[in-house]
Amino acid sequence: MSGSYDDRDGKIWMNGKLIEWRDANVHILTHAMHYASSVFEGERAYNGKIFKSVLHSQRLLKSAKMVDFEIPYSVDEIEKAKYDALRANKLEDAYVRAVAWRGAGEDMGVASLRNPVNLAVATWSWGNYYGDAKMKGAKLDVAKWQRPDPKTAPFEAKACLLYTSDAADEWIG
């Protein structure tokens, strides 16, 4: 699979159903788009088995609770969704991305607790992330941005809102 991530063949598991990859869309007024109310897991599958999958599913649920939303699926249901997506895309060795987010609803305030919570799982073939550097060694950068104080955000959560400070150095230069 190559090309733009929004224009691929395959299936994505979204809110209980396998849908066409290109149909996996969310509205521009989705709460997560404005307030980063989303959590995710990035996992690898080898020979059809997702590495430490249950632990990742447990952390996904825990991360969501830390940022004040509850994913409407159990660990077992998330596990089934991940493996359904792998099989639907006929993948054995793959990257598995589970993402949950507060969606568009009646509210657009910071909390928006009444808005629905969504879950999607995408799987795709993704080779060695580090390419040749895996054997040669990788160049590392240290962001000039300091992570927020642990009292300002739930730093244990694998939440989108906590990743931007690390990436901002790349964006800003």
Locate each region found by the language model.
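Single conserved hydrophobic/aromatic residue that forms the stacking wall/gate
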Residues: 163, 167-173
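Conserved alpha/beta cores of soluble small-molecule-handling proteins
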Residues: 1-165
